[in-house]
């Protein structure tokens, strides 16, 4: 049990803990976020359930100074990559570099029946989605020409009036939340981190998640030290 006001983790600890905040109202975000930060957690993630996670994260950003903040996960396909690129850029600036963009596909039923979207090649589409966001961010940060063309998305217009410009802290990292081996491998290729599903075993993490992520990292010329994996633990 953690005493009131006592940090959960020693500041020099190599173990990094994150937690997930679920609330019924936006008014319930600020105080818990501050308490979680004061307890020593490294990261606070907010799921996309009853409320827009980016609105909740904006509230959490105003109440905290150190803790990393991000959605775990935000649904990619209901949002255009350009729209999400702007939202993430603003949160990265508002948090002074503490924002982590977590993305996922959700399942077919939610995409088709809750959001009215066409369900098409979710894995490859998410991969292209991430590459599109990175191209947009490169335009924001480095002034490069926006000229992205893919199977699902095309972006080739960015004038100075609509370019927010570079951030001193740089673009935020992108994490993926997924289950199947293809998406795990894809995450290792194009993402910076991975959110494991809440229901897992040591075997599934090793064989289904980590092995495939490492294959993807090898494809991208990176090592395991370049990548972050978060694995939730349920206490009963």
Locations of regions flagged by a protein language model:
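Active-site beta-loop-alpha junctions enriched in small/polar residues
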Residues: 22-24, 49, 74-76, 104-108, ...
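Glycine-rich "substrate-gating" loop/helix at the edge of Rossmann-like oxidoreductase active sites
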Residues: 74-79, 118
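N-terminal beta1-alpha1-beta2 module of alpha/beta enzyme domains
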Residues: 2-71, 77, 172
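Internal, glycine-rich beta/alpha segment that forms the wall or movable "lid"
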Residues: 12-15, 88, 92-193, 200-227
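Catalytic cores of alpha/beta
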Residues: 81-89
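Short secondary-structure boundary/hinge segments and terminal tails
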Residues: 54-55, 78-79, 109-110, 205
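Conserved beta-strand positions in the central sheet of alpha/beta enzyme cores
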Residues: 45, 68, 100-102, 195
């Amino acid at each position: 049990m953690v005493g009131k006001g006592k940090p959960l983790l020693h500041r020099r600890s190599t173990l990094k803990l994150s937690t997930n905040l679920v609330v019924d109202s936006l008014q319930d975000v600020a105080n818990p976020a501050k308490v979680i930060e004061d307890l020593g957690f490294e990261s606070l993630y907010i799921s996309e359930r009853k409320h827009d996670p980016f609105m909740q994260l904006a509230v959490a950003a105003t109440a905290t100074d150190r803790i990393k903040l991000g959605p775990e996960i935000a649904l990619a396909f209901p949002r255009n990559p350009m729209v999400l690129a702007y939202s993430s850029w603003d949160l990265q600036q508002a948090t002074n570099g503490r924002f982590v963009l977590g993305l996922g596909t959700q399942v077919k039923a939610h995409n088709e029946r809750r959001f009215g979207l066409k369900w098409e090649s979710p894995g490859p589409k998410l991969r292209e989605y991430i590459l599109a966001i990175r191209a947009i961010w490169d335009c924001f940060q480095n002034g490069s020409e926006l000229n992205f063309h893919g199977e699902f998305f095309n972006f080739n217009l960015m004038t100075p009036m609509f370019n927010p410009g570079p951030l001193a802290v740089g673009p935020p990292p992108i994490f993926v939340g997924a289950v199947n081996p293809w998406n795990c491998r894809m995450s290792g290729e194009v993402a910076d981190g991975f959110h494991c599903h809440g229901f897992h075993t040591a075997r599934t993490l090793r064989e289904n998640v980590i092995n495939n992520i490492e294959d993807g990292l090898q494809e991208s010329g990176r090592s395991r030290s370049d990548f972050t994996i978060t694995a939730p633990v349920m206490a009963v």
